[in-house]
Curated annotation (Swiss-Prot):
Signal peptide: 1-16
Protein name, entry field: Calreticulin
UniProt similarity note: Belongs to the calreticulin family.
Domain notes: Can be divided into a N-terminal globular domain, a proline-rich P-domain forming an elongated arm-like structure and a C-terminal acidic domain. The P-domain binds one molecule of calcium with high affinity, whereas the acidic C-domain binds multiple calcium ions with low affinity.
Region (4 X 12 AA approximate repeats): 189-253
PANTHER family: CALRETICULIN (PTHR11073:SF2), CALRETICULIN AND CALNEXIN (PTHR11073)
InterPro entries: Calret/calnex, Calret/calnex_CS, Calreticulin, Calreticulin/calnexin_P_dom_sf, ConA-like_dom_sf
Basic and acidic residues compositional bias, start-end: 202-216, 227-249, 258-277
Disulfide cross-links: C103-C135
Subcellular location: Endoplasmic reticulum lumen
Protein's UniProt keywords contain Repeat: yes
């Protein structure tokens, strides 16, 4: 018991940095996680598994979705609810798709301590939602959503996610200066400020409602060329009588009326004439009202602050199951998170790449052997076949 407490203490304050949460799924136990029973008939089941072709059957264990076309909800309580006030917060995890995903979320959520994990679902309030989301060709992105004053705010930038079948590492760093970074596979893919890249605050500047466009403002960029004249021979009818048409032999003017030639398209017809367009010498550009300070804007130096973080959870809809979540870490040290990412993710990813390359090489060699065999003369092929003769006993 003492050794367990010591391990927990060391993990929380490892080497001078704080670890608020860590989960590496060292065995197949799922007892620390609570699966949601909300809308139970549509809920899929999470299991701790290593997937179809793990690099290491123990190291690769993770929280896996197991049923197609299901909602998923699961959460684990953080031993001590925390706030990131005055500190950097790093949220990191790995995800591997065990099969090709046509549509499915693979993002993590941080939840308040007042959540009921058994009733956890898509409308449950959360602090942060972070991670990949794939649906068809249109959606392949990393979500970064903050809840600010009760409203969820999506990042205004597009961050592409990985959609292959290898393990990938996703990292979000939120700093106390309201700056953030997003890393994929320990490489920075986006950074900026919470104020600029989310609409959590009203804009600093707005249009002056009292500013009016001057009466003589010209905002028409192009005008008709006054010197361009319509050619004299332009006006030709759209259709003309077909001179090759013949009056039917059985046409009776008394009964059928006077026969008229049918119309056909006129090859000389040029359509409606319009003068060419030229730059307007009086054009002043697009008029915009003067910008003034927004009286509704108020700087908030604590946009980054998330209080009472009490649960880690996954709330997903997946058409294609098989997502494996692992190596979940919440810490105040980007350096420690990077080290852990390299230690836990890198060797697995490199092994998966090597395995993929080896498989591709084997497939190529097999295809070449098959091709060579097909190109052999018939006699050569026959000589390779086992003989049908048998020695007599």
């Amino acid at each position: 018991m003492l050794s367990i407490l010591l391990t927990l203490l060391l993990s929380k304050y490892a080497l001078g940095h704080e670890v608020w949460f860590s989960e590496t799924f060292p065995n197949e136990s799922i007892e620390n996680w609570v699966q949601s029973t909300y809308n139970a008939e549509k809920q899929g089941e999470f299991k701790v598994e290593a997937g179809k072709s793990p690099v290491d059957p123990i190291e690769d264990l993770g929280l896996k979705t197991t049923q197609d076309a299901r909602f998923y909800g699961i959460a684990r309580k953080i031993s001590e609810p925390f706030s990131n006030r005055g500190k950097t917060m790093v949220l990191q995890f790995t995800v591997k798709f065990d099969k090709t995903v046509s549509c499915g979320g693979a993002y993590i959520k941080l939840l308040g301590s007042d959540i009921d994990p058994k009733k956890f679902h898509g409308e449950s309030p959360y602090k942060i939602m972070f991670g990949p989301d794939i649906c068809g060709m249109a959606t392949k992105k990393v979500h970064v959503i903050f809840n600010y004053k009760g409203k969820n705010h999506l990042i205004k930038k597009e961050i592409p996610c990985k959609d292959d079948l290898k393990t990938h590492l996703y990292t979000l760093i939120v700093n106390p200066n309201n700056k953030y970074e997003v890393l994929v596979d320990n490489a920075k893919v986006e950074e900026g400020s919470l104020e600029d890249d989310w609409d959590m605050l009203p804009p600093k500047k707005i249009d002056d409602p009292n500013d009016k466009k001057p009466d003589d403002w010209v905002d028409e960029q192009f005008i008709d060329d006054p010197d361009d004249k319509k050619p004299d021979n332009w006006d030709q009818p759209k259709t003309i009588p077909d001179m090759d048409a013949k009056k039917p032999d059985d046409w009776d003017d008394a009964m059928d009326g006077e026969w008229e030639r049918p119309q056909k398209d006129n090859p000389e017809y040029k359509g409606e004439w319009t003068p060419r367009r030229i730059d307007n010498p009086k054009y002043k550009g697009e008029w915009k009202p003067v910008q003034i300070d927004n009286p509704e804007y108020k700087h908030d130096p604590e946009l980054y602050v998330l209080n009472d973080i009490g649960y880690v959870g996954f709330d997903l809809w997946q058409v294609d199951s098989g997502s494996i979540f692992d190596n979940i870490l919440i810490t105040d040290s980007p350096d420690f998170a990077k080290e852990e990412g390299e230690r836990l993710w890198r060797k697995r990813y490199d092994a998966e790449v090597a395995k993929e390359q080896s498989s591709a090489k084997d497939d190529k060699e097999e295809a070449e052997e098959t091709k060579e065999r097909k190109e052999l003369p018939y006699d050569a092929k026959a000589s390779d076949e086992p003989s049908g003769d048998h020695d007599e006993l």
